[in-house]
From Swiss-Prot:
HAMAP family: Ribosomal_uL2_B. Belongs to the universal ribosomal protein uL2 family. This is Large ribosomal subunit protein uL2c. The keyword Coiled coil does not apply. Keywords: Chloroplast, Plastid, Ribonucleoprotein, Ribosomal protein. Residues 224-249 are annotated as: Disordered. The gene is rpl2. One of its GO terms (molecular function) is rRNA binding. It is found in: Plastid, Chloroplast. PROSITE patterns: RIBOSOMAL_L2.
Length: 294
């Protein structure tokens, strides 16, 4: 993927960058694999805002992506590489030998005409899906399942990949793009390779309207609101301090650096290295005999 730059002939193009879409081979999606996409605009069934800064945006049709890769031992051919408005990664259309068609996330360097397959005996090649237990150490993978046969849930964004670090017992240790290290069941499937469109993070929107096309509404600072709208609001003329010892959320809870993960979450024992605070858990100390200077 290449990035196209614009000259500053208008304020909106001064810092604007877009993709050249050079890897896209067709602009018509497979009709049998698209559905209507209903936008909730950040509201629940009562119309109450449950997620701020969402709403509007261009109409989109949802592409049905095969995250499970459960058509084992059936060879498929990459028919086209397409744009998906619902994600920053590209998608690849597969034609199976039995006539079925499915979309998958497009891995980097996978081209039209390539052959992919999923299953325990699949070769270690880009685009193939295998159980973690059969993937060699150090291999880059994406679209990883957290529970067997439930479909890939992590490492699906453009340009991301995880790395197989170790294998022990019924678990495989994986290093995620955030540098978090966690254990995953060895029966879980993952796809070989790195997700394509690696320059997606380098795109600059350039103007507010482009954010609105994506369905992103403005983010307003609490300090410029009224007291009825935010704990930071109010204060008279000009700029005023928030009047608190630390910043808080619109609902009065501490913000900036407060942990939000449930301390009793079932998967906590499987997370070996937490990056947010960069500390090693007791499980990692026992497993790798790591000494920490306190």
């Amino acid at each position: 993927m290449a990035i196209r730059l614009y000259r500053a002939y208008t304020p909106g193009t001064r810092n604007r960058t877009v993709s050249t879409f050079s890897e896209i081979t067709t602009d018509k999606p497979e009709k049998s694999l698209i559905n209507k996409h209903h936008f909730c605009k950040g509201r629940n069934n009562r119309g109450v805002i449950t997620c701020r800064h969402k709403g509007g945006g261009h109409k989109q049709r949802y592409r049905l992506i095969d995250f499970k890769r459960n058509r084992h031992n059936i060879i498929a051919k990459v028919a086209s590489i397409e744009y998906d408005p619902n994600r920053n990664a590209r998608i690849a259309l597969l034609h199976y030998l039995d006539g079925e068609k499915r979309y998958i996330l497009h891995p980097r360097s996978l081209s039209v005409g390539a052959i992919v397959v999923s299953g325990p005996m699949a070769p270690i090649e880009v685009g193939n899906a295998l159980p973690l237990s059969t993937i060699p150490l150090g291999t880059a993978v994406h679209n990883i399942e957290l529970r067997p046969y439930c479909g890939g849930q992590i490492v699906r964004s453009a340009g991301t990949y995880a790395q197989i670090v170790a294998k022990e017992g019924n678990f495989v240790t994986v290093k995620l793009p955030s540098s978090e290290v966690r254990m995953i069941r060895k029966e879980c499937y993952a796809t070989i390779g790195q997700v394509g469109n690696i320059d997606a993070s380098n795109i600059t929107l350039g103007k507010a309207g482009r954010s609105r096309w994506l369905g992103k509404r403005p983010t307003v600072r609490g300090v410029v609101m009224n007291p009825v709208d935010h704990p930071h609001g109010g204060g008279g003329e000009g700029k005023s301090p928030i009047g608190r010892s630390r910043p808080v959320t619109p609902w009065g809870k501490p913000a900036l650096g407060v942990k939000t993960r449930n301390p009793n979450k079932y998967s906590n024992p499987y997370v070996l290295l937490v990056v947010n605070k960069v500390y090693l858990t007791y499980n990692l100390i026992l497993k790798y005999n790591v000494e920490i200077n306190t």
